[in-house]
Amino acid sequence: MLSDKFREYSLRKYAARRDCIAKSTANKISAYSGDMRTALEYLYGTLPLDDVRFTPFEWMEEACAAALETREGNQYGVDIPEDIFAQYVLCPRVNNERAQRHRRFFAEKLKARVQGKSIADAALSVNLWCCEQVTYHSSDDRTEGPITAYLSGIGRCGEESAFAVCALRSVGIPARQVYSPWWSHCDDNHAWVEVYTGDGWHYMGACEPEYELDRGWFMAASRRAMLVHSRAFSSYAADGLAGEELIEKRGEAYLFNQTARYADTVELNISVIRGNAAVCGAKVHIQLLNMAAYRDIAVLTTDGEGRAQLRCGKGSIHISIEHNGAYFERDIDTSICTEVMCKPGEFVQGYTSGIFRAPQSAPSNRTAADKAKQAEMKAATINAAALRERRINAYYDEFTASHKCSEVWLPYIRAARGNADEIGAFLLLQGEADMPYALKMLQTISEKDMRDTDAAALMYHMKRVLPNKHGMDDSLFINYVLCPHIGMEPICKWDEEGLSMLDANSAAVAKLRLSGMPARLSPATGAAEYMQNGRWMPLNAVPMGRLELAGDGLKQGESWALTRLKDGEYLPLNMGELPLCMDIPAGKYALMVTNRLPSGDQQYVANRFELAEGERLGFTLARPKAELSELLGHTALCDAIVYDKHGQAFPLASLCAGNAALIAFLQPGGEPTEHFLNELYDAYERLSAVCRVVIVLPSSGSSSLAYARFADKYGRIDTYIDADEVQEPLARAAFKEPGDYPLLFLMGGYPDCRFASAGYSVGSVELIIKLAALI
């Protein structure tokens, strides 16, 4: 079933790893022959070394056997190329999620769902099942495993997509996570799923079911992407993947370029020279301005002629190179310039300013939605949410019904969701004297830790660390000695194996805490620190300087950020809120202040400086000012229908004929909407003189004193009902947060949205009046 070419590739990769593989594991692999042995050699030869060292052999064995069964059975009747099978069915890893045994578990849950269906219909059915299990919930950057996602019922987009890919692969459907590391037009990123159906790759939103493939709310955003990539854990390519462009190898992962399948692209050609010689092996950081900092989307390596290429979107990028003590930085608008000559030299200090351009949206080839099928899917999604909540609530109900629980335990048992048995078991093991510290320890860990930490790991920390209290202040002891959470790692025992899985700084903190010394990672730099005489001291002393920053109305990570330049990459520091005074390591820095415009473009002021040991620097930050006309852009909204009080349907396009119209989705009774209504009450006559005002209320028919006062004063108002919840797709089309009221769209004729805002800001009605006068 597996080809000689694949056998040779797998054996070669496995042989190169033999020194890293335990003898007992190697013996188990050699006990197999044929395809099963080849599959095991492939996984042990290509997966990240932590998987090879720490994943139980039985998990790998199960993944191989299950994948080979799906290939032999070929229940969908689709010819799946061997390289696509190897990378996107056989491989149990999707990205950097926590490794968990899942293949048979998901396959058993899904086999009836996919029985007798085409591969495309099976993929849609699996995604609906995924929605029944998991929904979106923002959380920290650590990626939970697929079983944790299932037991929790929640995950951020990277976790939803990893979960969905694992589910799809478990029933033999080739699937991969597709990722835009950073958007250019808004401060965010996104991950979704692609499935291979025999006629190519097709996308879908993970745990966001649709009635057909190639639909998803994120498509408007992806058409403005600067980079979209997929990930695989081997370089094996035969018939299915031979044409895919490799961007870079990152650890054991290979990143492949998918941008041209979503957005308009150009080929960027970069040359790096020093003097008259080409620079070979230089790392070229391709960055976007996001969350007020330059952030990597790709790292290229120059070839023997000093050249590197990247197919990317049409907008601004930042190129950063640090090579052998020489530096190069430059903003490039790839819609204008695609050939860049880089000549590294001195680090240039001082202020620069400009506009960082977001790409325009590529044309859409999406067909009109089938309203009847959309309605069916909406009903299925509502049912999925009910099933999911019932299952998640049952974990809490079953544990509390079968165990005698103290009232103070209940918040922790509920927060644990599907991990209730483990958190409950930990609490049941505590004696009366230790219980207060057990509860306080649980208060120090994250929501995600609560959902995927086992009782044994928590008990380890209680037994090893609690005896070290020795009269230490409770707060210091609990947060910086007893706390088993350090950085982004899963909570584990800090034995030899556990420490080997931590990075150097986290391992240093763990060892200090085990010895009874209060320790942490520096909030600013991430370096290990310990407490001495009431002050946090760096474990490894480095030259330090002092930085003082001031500024009004600026939020870190939104309108300003401080980053340190290291090996060509700008690493953000968590500085806290302004004003501030902080000691930071001597080095080269960029202090950025940004102002994002409605078009997605950003005004920026960058201050590059070098901080010397013992030096004290101070800066006052100010947001760049935009001209009023710069607040107007062009964004195409999707078709949408609202209803009058009699139930008659009105397309928004029919309500926005003419030069200017304001569509205001409101939630009367909610504080942000109430503030907006108070402004509207005072300025409605001036507003209605420059644009038509269309007010859309939720189908729940909410009202308030502020809305009644406004309606009483102005009498007949264009008021409609959002019975179809069109605010969500409209908000996403304008790159705003759904459900963040008031949601305002200033139209220059439908579907041309010239300005949009979500949430209340002081003076929003006055701003709309001024902008409408310009349309």
Protein language model regions, located:
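Short, acidic Ser/Thr/Gly-rich low-complexity loop/linker segments typical of extracellular
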Residues: 290-312, 566-580
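Thioredoxin-like thiol-disulfide oxidoreductase module
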Residues: 701-740
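Short active-site neighborhood of thiol/selenol oxidoreductases, capturing the structured segment around
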Residues: 652-680, 693-695
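Short Pro-Gly-centered beta-turn/loop motif in secreted/extracellular proteins
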Residues: 305-325, 331-335, 412-415, 577-599, ...
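Secondary-structure boundary elements
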Residues: 2-152, 374-496
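Thiol/disulfide oxidoreductase modules built on the thioredoxin-like
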Residues: 724-770
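Hydrophobic/aromatic-rich core segments of domains that either
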Residues: 108-128, 137-147, 152-248, 257, ...
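Structural motif
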Residues: 255-282, 289-291, 548-559, 565-567
